[in-house]
Amino acid sequence: MRLSLHFLGILLLSLACLSAGAESQRKLTSYQKYISKYSDLAIQHQKKYRIPASITLAQGLLESGAGQSDLARRSNNHFGIKCHSDWRGGRVYHDDDLRGECFRKYKRVEDSYDDHSRFLAERSRYERLFKLNIKDYKGWAKGLQKCGYATDRKYANKLIKVIEDYELYQYDTAKKERK
């Protein structure tokens, strides 16, 4: 009896490890697909707006759950950008820091990328970030947090971890989009 309980314990522990591994593998696969799909767009925006492609990709991955979050699916909003008073486009309401907050809604994901780049480039609170070296993703991540892009106090560390885990910094030095 003791041997079968011991065996059962090992079996349950093994199943738990396999389940955690499968979840980790699903996340890895969804992140890789997202990166493959949007890296060229992030590189284009880096060239046009001088926002590191690694930062754009990491923010898109985190804010949208690799495009799979409820908000991303309902609104094509991959950056968690809220409506603000000057927003005249589509809207969707989503629980975030508060219930029923207004978020920007886009026709296409590409429109979300365009708006994200303009959002950073045209707001004075982010101005100092554009003085950083394009390869300084750590400076950008910390700067976004200091400027109040997100309310999460660990936002910069999360961006940096995603950039380093998925080697997104390689896109900051890309000469052109992949074919």
Give residue spans per PLM region.
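Catalytic cores of secreted/periplasmic lytic hydrolases that degrade extracellular macromolecules
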Residues: R2, L18-K179
